[in-house]
Regions:
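Hydrophobic positions on the alpha1 helix immediately C-terminal to the Walker A/P-loop
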Residues: 66
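Nucleotide-state-sensitive switch-loop elements of NTP-binding domains
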Residues: 6-15, 23-50, 72-156, 163-170, ...
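Walker A (P-loop) phosphate-binding loop of P-loop NTPases
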Residues: 60
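Hydrophobic anchor at the beta1->P-loop junction of P-loop NTPases
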Residues: 53-55
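Conserved small/polar residues in nucleotide/adenosyl-binding loops
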Residues: 235-237
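Conserved lysine of the Walker
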Residues: 63
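Conserved catalytic-core segment of NTP-binding enzymes
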Residues: 129-141, 151-227
Length: 237
């Protein structure tokens, strides 16, 4: 028998800055608790102000390092940050692997930062099916920015574009990411393209190829946002 949940008290505690209340609310979301509808209704009046940034890219391109760097930059501006790192599900428990949280441990004791790993649980799209509700929890809890790091990128893994206010696509030279991005339709969903590990050979060629492919796309009309392609080497940050 599930324990009864005092939803109004839990939401009020989360809005007051209690990380335990935020964790409890996200757990209710992930577990599909019977009180989930009541939770979402209670959060609704307090959500809608957070800016959501999605980070996606193939495994090994440096998503977690980039997320951590963005987190630090936003904290320097005094912003309250939430991070949802969607990990591949454990084949045994269905729970999230905690590698991302280990890499972000420098911010773990910051009261203005909330970091949560979420299991994809086999859901395609690079996200967990509960990610939208978890974003609403962090939004209502007062986060100014929510960073969402996806499992990866592929033909089916473009959900982040419909969920985030801005989507950052990370690529690396020498991994064939530019060609794969074109095949997967990622060029249509990215707001910013970052060629990470730009100290490697082939970075300039990757940037050039991406800019060329974007110029051939459908976002070249006047007034439309044309995604920039930038180089980044986080080893220097």
């Amino acid at each position: 028998m599930r324990r009864a949940v005092d939803v109004p008290a839990l939401v009020e505690s989360a809005r007051a800055g209690s990380p335990r209340a935020v964790a409890r609310l996200i757990s209710l979301v992930e577990d599909g608790h019977p009180a989930l509808r009541e939770v979402m209704a209670a959060l609704a009046p307090h959500s809608g102000s957070a800016y959501v940034i999605g980070l996606t890219g193939s495994p090994g391109v440096g998503k977690s390092t980039s997320t951590t760097a963005l987190l630090g930059a936003f904290r320097e501006r005094g912003l309250r940050i939430g991070v949802l790192a969607v990990d591949p599900s454990s084949p045994f428990s269905g729970g999230a692997l905690l590698g991302d949280r280990v890499r972000m441990q420098d911010h773990a004791l910051d009261p203005e930062v909330y970091i949560r790993s979420m299991a994809s649980r086999g859901h395609l799209g690079g996200l967990s099916w509960t990610t939208p509700q978890a974003i609403r929890v962090l939004d209502a809890a007062g986060c100014d920015v929510v960073l969402v790091e996806t499992v990866g990128v592929g033909q089916s893994e473009v959900e982040i574009a419909g969920l985030a206010d801005s989507s950052v696509v990370l690529l690396a030279p020498g991994m064939g990411d530019g060609i794969q991005a074109a095949k997967a339709g990622i060029l249509e969903i990215g707001d910013v393209f970052v060629v990470n590990k730009s100290d490697r050979d082939g970075a300039d060629a990757t940037v050039r190829d991406l800019r060329h492919m974007i110029s051939l796309g459908d976002r070249t009309e006047p007034g439309l946002w044309r995604p920039p392609v930038v180089k980044l080497s986080l080893i220097h940050i």
